[in-house]
Amino acid sequence: EAIEEADFVIKLLEDYDIDGPVAYDWEMHDSSYRVYGTSPEMATACAIAFCQRIEEAGYTPMIYAGQYVSYMKYDQGAISPYLSWYPEYKTTSSEKLYPTFFYQMDYWQFSSSCSIDGIGGKVDANIQFIR
């Protein structure tokens, strides 16, 4: 199924000149999600399958995952060849603004409520780290 998802994304991207990474975002918030209960081995295999297919099509793959999925569902060693995008937001004004993720990350999403001139509403904000 992850390969089918990658093929779907590749088809959508055909008409665009993409120079940034293409992200795999596997989310599982609660037991109402179809993927709830997926083993770490299967979650990791799906992420890798998606990334391999995206790479075969000439794009740069990336894995987007929050704390639970990153620590409990993905084998970090197995997915380490791919770029990673990690969301972690400051929840109180007294918290320091830096990520607490133990593993290397390539992108850090530090906010979901930034204001950017020319864009209506709140948007996500990210920082890219250069390897």
Predicted regions and their residues:
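Substrate-binding cleft of extracellular glycoside hydrolase catalytic domains
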Residues: E1-Y59
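Functionally critical loop-and-helix segments that line ligand-binding/catalytic clefts
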Residues: I79-R131
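Alpha-helix initiation/capping motif
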Residues: G66-Q67, D75-Q76, D124
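Structural recognition of the beta-strand scaffold that forms the well-ordered cores
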Residues: G20-W26, T60-A65, L83-P87, D106-Q109
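Active-site-proximal loop/turn and secondary-structure-junction residues that shape catalytic pockets
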Residues: M28-D30, Q67-V69, K90
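Aromatic-lined carbohydrate-recognition surfaces of secreted/lumenal glycan-active proteins
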Residues: I54-M72
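Short, structured secondary-structure boundary patches
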Residues: F8-E14, Y74-Y89
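Extracytoplasmic/secreted cell-surface and envelope-processing proteins
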Residues: E1-A2, S31-P40, S70-Q76, S94-K96, ...
